[in-house]
Curated annotation (Swiss-Prot):
Keywords in alphabetical order: Cell membrane, Ion transport, Magnesium, Membrane, Repeat, Transmembrane, Transmembrane helix, Transport
Keyword Magnesium included in the entry's annotation: yes
GO terms of biological process kind: cobalt ion transport; iron ion transport; magnesium ion transport; manganese ion transport; nickel cation transport
Main location per the UniProt record: membrane
Highest classification ranks of the organism: Eukaryota, Metazoa, Chordata, Craniata, Vertebrata
Name of this chain's protein: Solute carrier family 41 member 2
Organism: Gallus gallus
InterPro entries reported in the protein's UniProt record: SLC41_membr_dom, SLC41_membr_dom_sf, SLC41A1-3
Segments on the Cytoplasmic face: 184-195, 267-282, 335-347, 398-406, 491-499, 565-573
Membrane topology: Multi-pass membrane protein
Length: 573
């Protein structure tokens, strides 16, 4: 306040705030102000402000602010059918100079999306991404963020139509990848360095570990309004692309190590030159494919937002539309090129691997400069690495099956069944995650989601997630029939389309997706209850399980067909 001589004075205030911090000691230095600004200055000192009309701002009854104003420290989540806006205040100002520095994991939930996932739990990727970190330094200006948004209402028919086109695109992409794999399996590198087959599911699984996770995370960010600001949008995009390149390089290297170990265990044979070739091929493929797919993914997300399409329905399948084809083509080309140089130019392979590994620090520096990805450099590796290991086990099954000349027909169908299963379960996981972000806070489940999870609960009901599970399951059989007929028309593969083969294949595909959607219903809610972001944690596990289940069920199906006499040795060879 100012004294009679116009000099500024210091006002000290002790206030008891009903929050976790107890007593708060504020020391506020006020310069000379005009009388007409005095009321606004007092209002700016209130630690909780609800942005409403100016005339309602002055209402006060019995010491309690009305029409949405709560006492200091009570940051209630307000649900409304209309858009609700919050005034986001600075925690540093709130804590003042009482000696308590604001924690990076302090509880401030101005809306559901800004919940801090590191609140006594493991930090997750969306923890840093979806929080409101951009607090203005001007304490006299209100920063308005959008609050609770309603999930877009969709009928089953609209949902199916939105999913159908990207689903078919993704399916044809996996069909093309399967035909490419059917061709390249006869190349020298695939014949002499069979561990490359172990790399195939692990590297194709990167779309589930990274691309689909990015797609689901950005889709959630779009639906809850976190990409409305251009600055915030590009911070999310640039930071996450740099982070994704770091993760892709590390996972590619670890996938090669896993392939070397899993390839060595059955026969006990080890080749150092082959190990270097695997590492270089894997790292280079992961880096290049991840960069290309990441750019495509960002374009899809931004385009979906501008056209009004729900990105949850289209982003994840489009992320996989050309992902398998791009990754497999790059892997085959690089590995074959390095293999031809193995004898004459032996130094080319280690130089290629060293070059892409040397780019990792640059990606770390870029990612560390963005608040959205800084914390993820120290966390979020668990699901990515675990999913890579699960996919590598599926690759070992594929390598073992392909080594049997009677079962080589499995090659063309493996990317198809794995890709389709992963696409469908990623859509469901992304939709459930968006629903939870809009209707609950991490650590707390909605009432309808509590209890034991069983298949009937996943597929029977009138909830939006029940309907999406039904739609996705109904797409399995007609979708795979289209893809099987496409493979038949292209005269690819080593298996003819007999009725018994179609029945066995469709049963394996249906069982895979049925199991994955059931697991997804439990897993997404499980991670949400644990306070972990399901966009970052569930999708890598689910797509990896899709690879493992698809490859295993397909291998069992081909063994069954061979036992009952449905045998085709060289169809389309």
């Amino acid at each position: 306040m100012t004294n009679c001589k116009g000099r500024s004075t210091i006002t000290k205030t002790n206030s008891k705030v009903h929050d976790r911090e107890g007593f708060v000691n504020w020391t506020i230095s006020l310069s000379t102000v005009q009388s007409d600004k005095f009321l606004n200055l007092l209002l700016s000192m209130v630690p909780v402000v609800y942005q409403i009309n100016q005339d309602e701002r002055h209402k006060k009854v019995n010491g309690v602010w009305q029409d949405g104003l709560q006492p200091a420290g009570h940051n209630y989540n307000v649900k409304s059918d209309q858009h609700v806006e919050y005034h986001h205040f600075s925690e540093q100002t709130f804590h003042g100079s009482n000696g308590h520095s604001p924690s990076s994991c302090s509880p401030k939930y101005d809306d559901f999306s800004s919940y801090n996932y590191c609140d006594g739990m493991d930090a997750s990727e969306t923890d840093a991404m979806l929080q409101e970190d951009n607090i203005s330094s001007d304490s006299n200006e209100d920063i308005i963020v959008e609050g609770i948004r309603k999930q877009p209402k969709e009928s089953s028919s609209i949902m199916a139509l939105q999913i159908l086109v990207p689903f078919l695109l993704a399916g044809f992409g996996t069909v093309t990848a399967g035909m490419v794999l059917d061709i390249v399996q006869h190349w020298d590198v695939f014949k002499n360095v069979t561990e490359v087959f172990i790399l195939v599911p692990a590297l194709l699984g990167l779309k589930g570990n990274l691309e689909m996770t990015l797609a689901s995370r950005l889709s959630t960010a779009v639906n809850i309004g976190k990409m409305d600001s251009p600055i915030e949008k590009w911070n999310l995009i640039i930071g996450n692309l740099a982070l994704k390149q770091v993760q892709a390089t590390v996972v590619g290297f670890l996938a090669a190590v896993a392939a070397v170990i899993l390839g060595w265990i059955p026969e006990g044979k080890y080749s150092f030159s082959h190990s270097i070739l695997l590492c270089s091929s894997s790292v280079a493929t992961a880096f290049i494919a991840s960069l290309l797919q990441g750019i495509i993914m960002v374009g899809v997300i931004v385009g979906s937002k501008k056209t009004g399409i729900n990105p949850d329905n289209v982003a994840t399948p489009i992320a996989a539309s050309f992902g398998d084809l791009i990754t497999l083509a790059i892997l085959a080309w690089i590995s074959q090129g390095l293999y031809t140089c193995l004898e004459t130019y032996y130094y080319v392979s280690p130089l290629v691997g060293a070059f892409f590994l040397a780019l990792t620090p640059m990606g770390i520096v870029i990612a560390a400069k963005h608040p959205a990805t800084r914390t993820v450099l120290h966390s979020g590796w668990e699901p990515v690495i675990t999913a890579m290991i699960i996919s590598s086990i599926g690759g070992l099954i594929l390598d073992t099956t392909v080594s049997d000349p009677n079962l080589v027909g499995i090659v063309v169908y493996t990317p198809v069944i794995n890709g389709i299963g992963g696409n469908l379960v990623a859509i469901q996981a992304s939709r459930i995650s968006t629903y939870l972000h809009l209707h609950s806070i991490p650590g707390e489940l909605p009432e309808e989601a509590k209890g034991c999870y069983y298949p009937c609960r996943t597929y029977y009901g009138t909830g939006v997630n029940n309907k999406s599970a039904q739609v996705l399951l109904l797409l399995v059989i007609p979708g795979h029939l289209i893809f099987l007929y496409t493979i038949h028309l292209m005269k690819s593969g080593h298996t003819s389309l007999t009725p018994i083969f179609i029945a066995v294949y469709l049963f394996a595909a249906l069982l895979q997706v049925f199991t994955l959607l059931w697991i997804a219903d439990w897993m997404v809610h499980h991670f949400w209850k644990k306070g972990k972001d399901p966009d970052s944690f569930s999708i890598p596990y689910l797509t990896a399980l899709g690879d493992l289940l698809g490859t295993a069920l397909l291998a069992v199906g081909f063994h069954f067909l061979w036992l009952i006499g449905d045998r085709d040795g060289d169809v389309g060879d």
